[in-house]
């Protein structure tokens, strides 16, 4: 699954176009490296998303096959503080 789509489906970022812009401006790191929106996300990848004044750290647990309900997000992404 594409990185920008994963960010949208897991509700880390609200809109896919914003996810694409963040990736293009090197504000999304996967395993410590800036990645393009087309990067193919894998189970176990560690994400760092810099969004406004926030930094979101997350680990990919599973790749969703479709849009998720809010209560199901924890099955696919583990957030760090």
PLM-predicted stretches and their roles:
Residues 54-81:
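C-terminal structural segments of small proteins and small subunits
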Residues 32, 46, 73-76:
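Short linear motifs in intrinsically disordered/low-complexity regions
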Residues 1-43:
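A basic, amphipathic helix-loop patch mediating RNA/tRNA/ribosome contacts
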């Amino acid at each position: 699954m594409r990185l920008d789509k994963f960010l949208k489906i897991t509700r880390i970022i609200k809109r896919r176009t914003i996810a694409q812009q963040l990736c293009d401006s090197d504000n999304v790191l996967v395993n410590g490296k800036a990645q393009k929106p087309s990067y193919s996300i894998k189970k176990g990848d560690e994400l760092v998303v810099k969004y406004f004044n926030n930094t979101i750290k997350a680990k990919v647990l599973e790749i969703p096959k479709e849009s998720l309900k809010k209560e199901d997000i924890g099955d696919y992404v583990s957030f760090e503080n």
